[in-house]
A protein has these predicted regions:
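Bacterial Sec signal peptide processing site at the extreme N-terminus
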Residues: 16-33
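Conserved polar/disulfide-associated segments of primarily extracytoplasmic proteins
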Residues: 46-136, 141
Length: 171
């Protein structure tokens, strides 16, 4: 995956707590959620801005999970939050998307094609709203490899379990 694509992944996120952990293929966030890591081929990218960033070399692609826990963010419309995840793309074309329910919570999905630094890419963004937290999921890949990773991304997002049992302080 190109550096600009990773920049897009990082540019849309707020810094979070660093007390997350991975056990037996499950990522646990101190912000009250957990997700299963995708199947073979994806590796954790350490030191990213998101709580969990994953990358795949062949075919190239990246995905992330992150959460923002504050009343202001949680009060924004899902359409705005979802669009925010793909800011920075040029020549954006919304191919698919709309409201859905994930883990019993309202969510929004958008599949977008566009370009980043002149290179064509595909992106799929999913935002899930909890009571106080907003959970962001993003998958980005070069246009030629985009469809290859979408099944892994779908499985990753659908594994979401929200707990929100933290006591304040999470951002």
């Amino acid at each position: 995956m190109t550096k600009p694509a990773w920049a897009l992944l990082g540019a849309v996120l707020l810094t979070g707590c660093s007390a997350s952990r991975i056990e037996n293929g499950v990522f646990y966030s101190p912000k009250g959620y957990q997700v299963n890591l995708p199947r073979q081929g994806w590796a954790v990218k350490p030191g990213g801005a998101a709580e969990l960033e994953l990358q795949r070399q062949d075919p190239a692609g990246g995905m992330l999970a992150d959460a923002t826990c504050d009343d202001k963010t949680a009060g924004r419309p899902l359409t705005v939050l979802t669009r925010h995840l793909t800011f920075g793309l040029k020549d954006r074309v919304l191919e698919d998307g709309g409201p859905l329910t994930l883990a019993g919570r309202p969510a929004q999905r958008a599949v977008v094609r566009g370009s980043l630094d002149g290179a064509p890419i595909g992106a799929e963004a999913v935002v899930i709203k909890g009571e106080r937290c907003v959970y962001d999921f993003l998958y980005v890949a070069p246009a030629a490899a985009f469809e290859t990773g979408r099944g892994d991304f779908r499985t990753f997002v659908e594994s979401f379990v929200g707990v929100e049992s933290f006591s304040g302080g999470a951002r």
